[in-house]
Amino acid sequence: MEARPLATPEEAWRIASSLRYRHIEGTVVAVVQDVETKEVLMVGHMDPIAVVLTLTTGLAHYYSTTRKRIWLKGETSGHYQIVKEFRSDCDGDAVVIKVVQIGAACHTGSRSCFESKYSLIKALKLSLRHG
């Protein structure tokens, strides 16, 4: 599957400029969802440049708050995210990106960063144990 731009550079900058970068290090929160299954794959951060690169290349880019730089998802692993849809919330401080995930989305090698189930019962048992 081939990535295609979702916007021209001018449109991408207009979209990026309309967002409110009020989270960690001047970013918006990016919730990434599988376009077919609707499964939440991961949550990342995007600064204006990551938004523009994502929209103009059709490949998901994020701002790494630990490495302090833009990164292309899959640049080292080959597990790219081909962007099919990009939406912002009503406040403009979060986006949902619907993607075709190539390989694993999580750095642990799992398809999703949300594969571990933590139930209320487990939480209660832990609470009772540690009292």
Curated annotation (Swiss-Prot):
Q: Which cofactor does it need?
A: Mg(2+); Zn(2+)
Q: Which reaction does it catalyse?
A: 1-(5-phospho-beta-D-ribosyl)-5'-AMP + H2O = 1-(5-phospho-beta-D-ribosyl)-5-[(5-phospho-beta-D-ribosylamino)methylideneamino]imidazole-4-carboxamide
Record's subcellular location: Cytoplasm
Textual note on the cofactor? Binds 1 Mg(2+) ion per subunit. Binds 1 zinc ion per subunit.
| Cellular component GO terms, alphabetical | cytoplasm
| Chain residues that bind Zn(2+) | C90, C106, C113
Q: In which pathway does it act?
A: Amino-acid biosynthesis; L-histidine biosynthesis; L-histidine from 5-phospho-alpha-D-ribose 1-diphosphate: step 3/9
Q: What does this protein do?
A: Catalyzes the hydrolysis of the adenine ring of phosphoribosyl-AMP.
Record-stated family: Belongs to the PRA-CH family.
Listed name of the protein: Phosphoribosyl-AMP cyclohydrolase
Biological source species:
Pyrobaculum aerophilum (strain ATCC 51768 / DSM 7523 / JCM 9630 / CIP 104966 / NBRC 100827 / IM2)
